Amino acid sequence: MILDKIVAATKVRVEKAKLQKSFKTAKREALLNKKKNFVSFKKALSKAGINFICEVKKASPSKGLISTDFKYKEIALEYEKTGAAAISVLTEPNFFLGSIRYLQEIKSIVKIPVLRKDFIIDSYQIYESRVIGADAVLLICAVLSYDVLKEFLETAQGLGMSCLVEAHNEEEIETALKAGAEIIGVNNRNLRTFEVDFGNSMKLRRLVPVDKIFVSESGIKTKKHIDILKANDVNAVLIGEELMKSGNIAERLRELKD
């Protein structure tokens, strides 16, 4: 399965990163960076109405190359100017053609919070995320046990970062809540089959208490989708592909927002 391949590649990537910068050094640097240029991701998603997390995404396993002319800094600035609440940056290099450098450079030019979107399976990546400037990290229930998820949440929050905890079914929602997640994202894409079911957010919304921030991810393509989510008290949406492929990011984002 593609998810297993991504996780296996991530393990290799993390071990290589540790050879460049030790765990001890990464942790020390993260603690020194604890409040440096920090912007609250949670606060940005707590505003009334639907808040947009707009994604900077070059490629994906399901769609292949999404952006041939990948001017990631210009894209991020366009998102910010058009009213995005936050920016999600893919840093996974093997399957999504992402890069830590993209996040670092984007963070240096925007004022809104930046989410690191990657497959985080080692606490080293949490410390690394704070060092590179991430305001929030994605934690995926499908690749983490309850104990590890809880540990990662506590580590990230101890560094001042928010966590978007991603779930795909009832069991994962229960795990996320039990672990203490404050921001829960429901992925409408099944990470094992990569099939999309927009109704997944609607089905799982009722399981998440209203005092938590609820984010709908993947497969959101139309204003009608946004209106349905809004009617179901969804706090935020994560959109990437629809914007990246539009040809005019600002215009497409305005169409979905307004």
Curated annotation (Swiss-Prot):
It catalyses: 1-(2-carboxyphenylamino)-1-deoxy-D-ribulose 5-phosphate + H(+) = (1S,2R)-1-C-(indol-3-yl)glycerol 3-phosphate + CO2 + H2O. SUPFAM superfamilies: Ribulose-phoshate binding barrel. GO terms for molecular function: indole-3-glycerol-phosphate synthase activity; phosphoribosylanthranilate isomerase activity. Keywords: Amino-acid biosynthesis, Aromatic amino acid biosynthesis, Decarboxylase, Lyase, Tryptophan biosynthesis. It comes from the Bacteria. Its EC number is 4.1.1.48. It is an enzyme of class 4 (lyase). The keyword Acyltransferase does not apply. GO terms for biological process: L-tryptophan biosynthetic process. It holds the Pfam family IGPS. Pathway: Amino-acid biosynthesis; L-tryptophan biosynthesis; L-tryptophan from chorismate: step 4/5. Coiled coil: none annotated. Belongs to the TrpC family. This is Indole-3-glycerol phosphate synthase. The gene is trpC.
